[in-house]
Amino acid sequence: MLLAIDVRNTHTVVGLLSGAKQHAKVVQQWRIRTESEVTADELALTIDGLIGEDSERLTGATGLSTVPSVLHEVRIMLEQYWPSVPHVLIEPGVRTGIPLLVDNPKEVGADRIVNCLAAYQQFAKAAIVVDFGSSICVDVVSAKGEFLGGAIAPGVQVSSDAAAARSAALRRVELARPRSVVGKNTVECMQAGAVFGFAGLVDGLVARIREDVKGFSADDDVAVVATGHTAPLLLPELHSVEHFDEHLTLHGLRLVFERNREAQRGRLKPAR
């Protein structure tokens, strides 16, 4: 059983995966709030409480964090509470197997890397990956499995909350699909702007990528896959997205874990 920890700015996903390679599957998943000042002990109490008896069945652990301080605590937690369980955390120096063809590879978030890795492994062709989180990341991986870069926009909830915080006449609303793109009250108007507006934003970015990037035209075979906790809200309004995989990041973490563990055992040549 593999423990996978995906720490983002707002929420943390904890998952358990059974099997390996093409037979791997996510058997449990939990979403908890990310606390930037959480300690290793607090993390251990929370995760041990979630996974229960499966704690004794762990054969490996892996994780990433877009919050550097939390990644440090995850490392301490694994070393102190599961010292016999091998672990691989996504950080500089870790083999991912995906070349980063960007100006500064160290700036690329670990979440973006593992998402593209998982998409390429799943579809075996060029892909555009849309991750709906605190930010919306639209990332591009070539037919050769190279990370080409992408675009980052504010997330749906973040933008909606910011609009409410900066205007006395607006308030925080529940993100839900309104009856129409033409809202009849303030809540519906904000929902329409969030749902239909961001669907248009993503469709526009995907269309621009397919126009501007060689090998991604309408005539090319390209997978467009979405992931992230707000993706289901927008999927019915998206025209460009063909696939949805809620476990894409967890599988990307698994792939990096497997690659590094096998490399350590000498069964793989070091990845680029």
Curated annotation (Swiss-Prot):
It is found in: Cytoplasm. Substrate binds at G109, A110, D111, R112, T186. Pfam families: Pan_kinase (PF03309). SUPFAM superfamilies: Actin-like ATPase domain (SSF53067). It comes from Mycobacterium marinum (strain ATCC BAA-535 / M). Belongs to the type III pantothenate kinase family. It catalyses: (R)-pantothenate + ATP = (R)-4'-phosphopantothenate + ADP + H(+). The active site is at D111 (proton acceptor). The lineage of its organism: Bacteria, Bacillati, Actinomycetota, Actinomycetes, Mycobacteriales. Keywords: ATP-binding, Coenzyme A biosynthesis, Cytoplasm, Kinase, Metal-binding, Nucleotide-binding, Potassium, Transferase. InterPro entries: ATPase_NBD, Type_III_PanK. This is Type III pantothenate kinase. ATP binds at D6, V7, R8, N9, T10, H11, T12, V13, S134. Its cofactor is NH4(+); K(+). K(+) binds at D131.
